[in-house]
UniProtKB/Swiss-Prot annotation:
Annotated pathway: Amino-acid biosynthesis; L-methionine biosynthesis via de novo pathway; L-methionine from L-homocysteine (MetE route): step 1/1
Cofactor(s) needed for function: Zn(2+)
Catalysed conversion reaction: 5-methyltetrahydropteroyltri-L-glutamate + L-homocysteine = tetrahydropteroyltri-L-glutamate + L-methionine
Domain of life where this protein originates: Bacteria
Biological process according to GO: methionine biosynthetic process; methylation
Gene: metE
InterPro entries: Cbl-indep_Met_Synth_N, Cobalamin-indep_Met_synthase, Met_Synth_C/arc, UROD/MetE-like_sf
Provenance organism: Rhodopseudomonas palustris (strain ATCC BAA-98 / CGA009)
Note on how the cofactor is bound: Binds 1 zinc ion per subunit.
UniProt: L-homocysteine binding residues: 463-465, 516, 631
Claim: Heme is one of the keywords in the record: no
PANTHER family: 5-METHYLTETRAHYDROPTEROYLTRIGLUTAMATE--HOMOCYSTEINE METHYLTRANSFERASE
Record's protein name: 5-methyltetrahydropteroyltriglutamate--homocysteine methyltransferase
Role: Catalyzes the transfer of a methyl group from 5-methyltetrahydrofolate to homocysteine resulting in methionine formation.
């Protein structure tokens, strides 16, 4: 490396930080407020304290460009909707300041009991009950595991400045001594993230009405002293057409004409600009942020084509994953750029907002010391950037210890036997195409399965989990603290399992499940029993609102030391003569809901998990299981943002599912479950998975999702969900028979199973009992109609 350094100090910027607090203080404050145990003033006081602490922590770690307005009580897209007055009429807002009651109604609906209205896999947002108003729709933020509230627009949509939150938080920071860079979601990405209730409305046609509101708030920020404003436009890493590219030129041209002295840092992340590069470089902006973790090579084109006075924000530290950076390697990459452009035109930054990583690694006292030395959470990433800045600003000697420690950690990780297991890599290398194929085609398998299982037409089952009552959660917590012995906890769980099985028999279900009372989370339960995974105590990240998740850390080669579910399956099957499904989480879902190692391709890590699940499937079959369900709730979530990359992902994702499910005899029935709202564009991949039975979420779409399967002539069996588990409302027999008749119009009777949309973990037993009794009766009536 050249010893030449620049004399001016290099700016260190963050694009956004975790809002939840090191100990999830925001979660506690929100849930206390929602439960009526604290006041609005109490909540706002906690929020202000969290913001102040966030700014102080960044300043202390050498961040010189500190964001404001990155904080949110629920979601930054919802904040933007409120800011621009995009509040649907149903919420009763008629102008003026937007109350917290209105804000949270948009976020959560106004049903009486909101707790636990999510999907049982814990990664969905719930709908409201029929009373009150529903929440806005929620969906994934690009390809992350964060969820945003989808803006709703109508044909007569108007916008107005309804909230000055960005201005308030800028002033709040200024009063504390921090001159921040306010951050707002950019107008084009905001519109693209929304949806219209009116068919045929092009959301981008609303841009001329929206931009003046942005100009108003940006003008007020400038008047208050803001020299720079960060506008997030991650839509620039998506596939865009010429009309969408023109929208960027129109919006930013208008902003620049109205506010010529305000410097805009346009931020892009989650990928490279690709064919949108020329569009971005032609915009009248003062700075451009690039994700150089996901798209490191784009810097060359930007330097070659971009204006020489454009400030480049280099996203060189991974804002989405928890691995420590190799700082000497980064120095080698960044130094030539700084020398070429000058320190005043370069900023060092994470690749994206640090919202997607936990707050502070120092809170983890129980991690393996080697593993801990390879990790970096939000605060540590700020420190890494600060070290990099000092090394590039002539202060190399002062940070030599940090640089050496970084290099040592990277070298140790590359060679560690904790990461690399030759037996695993040898086994993965020996996988053959035959291992990803069932012995026979579906038609031959189905004949054998039907002979063996002797199920009625329209067989009834559930997706896997039953209600996790307060008693179960208390027992789990007590066991975790050591207050209940392993033996006593096991006895308690066996009792719950036995009751659930007796209850299912009484209701009349054809295919039973054991209820999953022993499982805390559908990914964590397996990760804790597989080598290559580690778990944190305080590694929380925000999923949505007050919901936080603690993703497993997939740090090394994966194998299964011993069976994970066989004991529970054998116990459950011993209590009934009816078929008991084995219940597993699929490899793609385990991968997509974890912090994944970055030293091998994701496909390699997934293949290893698939081999471990394959072993479990084989042991369940050996123990006598006739049906094994392998859930792939997150298969679709892993799709790359660019459609050109879909095939590559789907090829290996489907191969991994087939690898874990194809080692069984023809007469063993493989089930899978998926909870998505869109199948048309991946139906080929779903068919290629070749599961004998797939259960899907269809009740809210009135079975329209099945059109994709009908058009495709999908041959295998399908369980379209006949009731929405997200609502506590018990659907009538008639509602479910109506849905089944709609399903029969699209698929043959022999293909259809009858089941709820998703697992029942988050519902109460009273709701579940009423709904499943009606579901079994609906199936009985449809059998009569079909036979008649």
């Amino acid at each position: 490396m050249s010893s030449h350094t620049v004399s001016t100090s290099l700016a260190v910027a963050t694009l956004g930080t975790p809002r939840i607090g090191p100990r999830r203080e925001l979660k506690s404050a929100l849930e206390s407020f929602w439960a009526g145990k604290s006041t609005e003033a109490d909540l706002l006081k906690v929020a202000a304290a969290l913001r102040a602490a966030n700014w102080a922590r960044q300043s202390a770690r050498g961040v010189s460009v500190i964001p404001s307005n990155d904080f949110s009580l629920y979601d930054q897209v919802l904040d933007t909707s409120v800011m621009v007055g995009a509040i649907p009429e149903i919420y009763g807002w008629r102008g003026g300041p937007v109350s917290l009651a209105t804000y949270f109604a948009m976020a959560r609906g106004t049903q009486a009991e909101i707790a636990g209205h999510g999907c049982a896999n814990g990664h969905h947002h719930g709908d409201s009950t029929p009373q009150g108003v529903p929440a806005q729709e929620m969906t994934k933020w690009f390809d992350t595991n964060y969820h945003y509230m989808v803006p709703e627009f109508s044909a007569g949509q108007s916008f107005q400045l309804a909230s000055v939150k960005p201005l308030e938080e800028y002033r709040e920071a200024k009063a504390l001594g921090y001159d921040t860079r306010p951050v707002l979601l950019g107008p084009v990405t905001y519109l693209k993230l929304g949806k219209s209730a009116d068919a045929g409305l092009d959301v981008l046609s609303l841009l001329p009405k929206l931009v003046p509101v942005y100009i108003e708030i940006l003008g007020r920020l400038a008047a208050a002293g803001a020299k720079w404003v960060q506008l997030d436009e991650p839509a620039l890493v998506l596939d865009l057409d010429d009309r969408e590219r023109l929208a960027f030129r129109d919006a930013y041209g208008q902003i620049a004409r109205e506010l010529p002295h305000l410097d805009i840092m346009l931020t892009t992340y989650f990928g490279g600009l690709g064919d949108n590069l020329d569009t971005a470089l032609a915009l009248p902006i003062a700075g451009l942020h690039l994700d150089l973790v996901r798209a490191p090579k784009q810097i060359n084109a930007v330097i070659a084509k971009g204006p020489k006075d454009l400030v480049l924000s280099l996203g060189v530290v991974d804002g989405r994953n928890i691995w420590r950076a190799d700082l000497p390697d980064l120095l080698d990459r960044v130094e030539p750029i700084v020398q070429q452009r000058g320190a005043e035109r370069v900023q060092l930054a994470p690749s994206c907002s640090l919202l997607h990583v936990p707050v502070d690694l120092e809170l983890e006292t129980g991690l393996d010391p080697d593993l801990k030395s390879w990790l970096s959470f939000s605060l540590q990433k700020m420190g890494e950037l600060s070290t990099l800045s000092r090394a590039l600003s002539g202060d190399r000697a002062a940070v030599q210890d940090q640089l050496s420690a970084s290099a040592k950690a990277a070298a140790t990780r590359r060679k560690s036997p904790k990461v690399h297991d030759m037996a695993v890599s040898s086994r993965a290398a020996a996988v053959t195409p035959a291992m990803t194929q069932r012995n026979s085609g579906f038609a031959a398998r189905a004949t054998l399965q039907h002979q063996r299982l002797q199920l009625p037409a329209f067989p009834t089952t559930t997706i896997g989990s039953f209600p996790q009552t307060a008693q179960i959660r208390q027992a789990r917590a007590a066991h975790a603290k050591g207050a209940i012995s392993d033996a006593d906890y096991n006895t308690f769980l066996r009792g719950e399992t036995a009751r659930a099985i007796q209850w299912q028999e009484k209701v009349g279900l054809d295919v039973l499940v054991h209820g999953e009372f022993e499982r805390n989370d559908m990914v964590q339960y397996f990760g804790e029993q597989l080598s290559g995974f580690a778990f944190t105590k305080e590694g929380w990240v925000q999923s949505y609102g007050s919901r936080c998740v603690r993703p497993p850390i997939l740090f090394g080669d994966v194998s299964r030391p011993k069976p994970m579910t066989v004991g529970w399956w054998k116990y459950a099957q011993s209590l009934t003569g009816r078929p008991m499904k084995g219940m597993l989480t699929g490899p793609v879902t385990i991968l997509n809901w974890s912090f994944v190692r970055d030293d091998v391709p994701r496909s390699t890590a997934c293949l290893q998990i698939a081999l471990a699940i394959r072993d479990e499937v084989g042991d369940l079959e050996q123990a006598g299981a006739t049906m094994i369900q392998i859930d792939e709730a997150a298969l679709r979530e892993g799709l790359p943002l660019r459609r050109s990359e879909w095939k590559g992902y789907l090829d290996w994702a489907v191969e991994c599912f087939r690898l874990c499910s194809s080692g069984v005899k023809d007469e063993t029935q493989i089930h899978t479950h998926m909870c998505y709202s869109e199948f048309n564009d991946i139906i080929d991949a779903i068919a290629a998975m070749d599961a004998d039975v797939i259960s899907i979420e269809t009740s809210r779409s009135k079975m329209e999702l099945l059109d994709a399967f009908k058009t495709y002539k999908y041959p295998n069996e399908i369980g379209p969900g006949v009731y929405d588990i997200h609502s506590p409302r018990v659907p009538s027999v008639e509602e479910m028979t109506t849905l089944l008749q709609l399903a029969r119009q699209r698929l043959s009777d022999g293909q259809l199973w009858v089941n709820p949309d998703c697992g029942l973990k988050t519902r109460g037993w009273d709701e579940v009992q009423g709904a499943l009794v009606n579901m079994v009766e609906a199936a009985r009536q449809i059998r009569q109609v079909s036979a008649g």
